[in-house]
């Protein structure tokens, strides 16, 4: 625990990782990191960005609902975090990526038709936040050619796109596969 895994080596005795040997493992990372450990995944995905723009207004500022869809040019979802803090979520490639943080915050304030500027703002951008869910994308199963190694993550096959629910279901499926001893541990 607390150690970044830089590689793994399947051996007859188990899976060798950072000086340790394990009967089986779950690779539970984002696909771009899983590809470093399991090279067959390395080039399988394109990625989409997500940004969250926090806008702090006066404490009495509130939306009509705690979560609402925004139909403006940039904002998609607005979450009222209480006490005047709004979180604007933007996902997928768009014009917003070219805007500086101050410009993006100002554009969202204008879309929300707020009476004045926020007290402060903070923009968090993740360029590879999720894989691009394109039609007919080939998502890997949790099983790999080595039954002692299973995959978990929202990018693996599921009934859901890239969501937290998909990641949770994937993790459960991977754990159940190993708990069922489908990896044929050594005696």
Question: What residue ranges belong to the model's regions?
Answer:
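Mid-domain catalytic core of redox enzymes
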Residues: 3-113, 117, 140
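Short glycine-/acidic-enriched loop or helix-start segments at secondary-structure transitions
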Residues: 36-38, 133, 161-162
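Active-site-proximal substrate-binding core of FAD-dependent oxidoreductases
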Residues: 179-187
């Amino acid at each position: 625990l607390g150690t970044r895994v830089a590689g793994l080596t399947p051996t007859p005795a188990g899976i060798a990782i950072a000086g340790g040997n394990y009967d089986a493992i779950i690779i539970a990372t984002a696909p771009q990191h899983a590809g470093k450990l399991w090279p067959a995944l390395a080039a399988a995905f394109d990625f989409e960005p997500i940004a969250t723009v926090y806008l702090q207004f006066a404490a009495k500022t509130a939306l009509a609902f705690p979560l609402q869809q925004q139909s403006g040019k940039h904002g998609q979802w607005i979450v009222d975090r209480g006490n005047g803090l709004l979180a604007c979520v933007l996902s997928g490639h768009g014009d917003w990526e070219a805007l500086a943080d101050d410009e993006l915050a100002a554009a969202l304030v204008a879309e929300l038709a707020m009476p004045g500027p926020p007290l402060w703002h903070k923009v968090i951008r993740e360029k590879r936040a999720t894989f691009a869910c394109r039609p007919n994308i080939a998502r890997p199963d949790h099983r790999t050619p080595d039954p002692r190694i299973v995959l978990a993550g929202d990018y693996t096959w599921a009934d859901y796109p890239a969501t937290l629910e998909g990641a949770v279901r994937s993790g459960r499926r991977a754990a159940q596969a190993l708990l069922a001893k489908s990896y044929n541990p050594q005696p």
